[in-house]
Amino acid sequence: MEVEASYSYGFLPSGRHQPYAPPPPHPAEEGELWEYFPCPFCYIEVEVPFICNHLQEEHCFDTRNAVCPLCADNIGRDMGAHFRVQHSHLLKRRKPSRPSSSWPTPSNNSDPYFEGPPQYMMNNRTYQDPAPDPLLSQFICSMAQTDTNSDNTNTEIAVSAVSHDQRLSQRVTLTDDASKLELKERLQRIEFVKEIIMSTIL
């Protein structure tokens, strides 16, 4: 019962998560095309034979009372066949990627953990600092010039801020007297309203 409850909230037991698609059931033959179907929930391309497993394990999709998430038809027993027939326009056929054992290993890299497909490998060059981009250097140089200009303007702003603060302090003293008078009037009004309310209650 606990397992069903955890599935209804989208949580999977720790051993059930599969970050990658399971390995193919047989090695790829020359010219063979595999069918991939985009998952209707997360749009990851999954091989058609494994779409049921993906939907059950990753999205808690109930295949016993299965209704297709795309067309709302009853799927029946074979979900893969339903996707092939009813949603063939979404199928993608492509050659499987080569297994990692067939990747050529670089001669200077002795660690097999960092082996990868050739299109993602670096060109055996050491990293060099890139030359500055002329377009970006215009902005960088202009920033240095604006820094010197901003120092001059900062001093002018500081002087004007001091004089502005002096003016504000004078205004505050004038407004303090007015606010004390206003406060006294408001307190008198509050007392008057209290007396009226008390007289109506009694």
Curated annotation (Swiss-Prot):
Q: Where is the composition biased (Low complexity)?
A: 98-112
Q: What is the lineage of its organism?
A: Eukaryota, Viridiplantae, Streptophyta, Embryophyta, Tracheophyta
- InterPro entries reported in the protein's UniProt record: DI19 (IPR033347), Di19_C (IPR027935), Di19_Zn-bd (IPR008598)
Q: Which PANTHER family does the protein's record reference?
A: PROTEIN DEHYDRATION-INDUCED 19, PROTEIN DEHYDRATION-INDUCED 19 HOMOLOG 5
What is the designated name of this protein?
Protein DEHYDRATION-INDUCED 19 homolog 5
Region spans: Disordered: 88-120
The record, for Pfam families, names:
Di19_C, zf-Di19
User: Spans of biased composition, class Basic residues?
Assistant: 88-97
Which superkingdom heads the taxonomic lineage of this protein's source?
Answer: Eukaryota
Similarity section:
Belongs to the Di19 family.
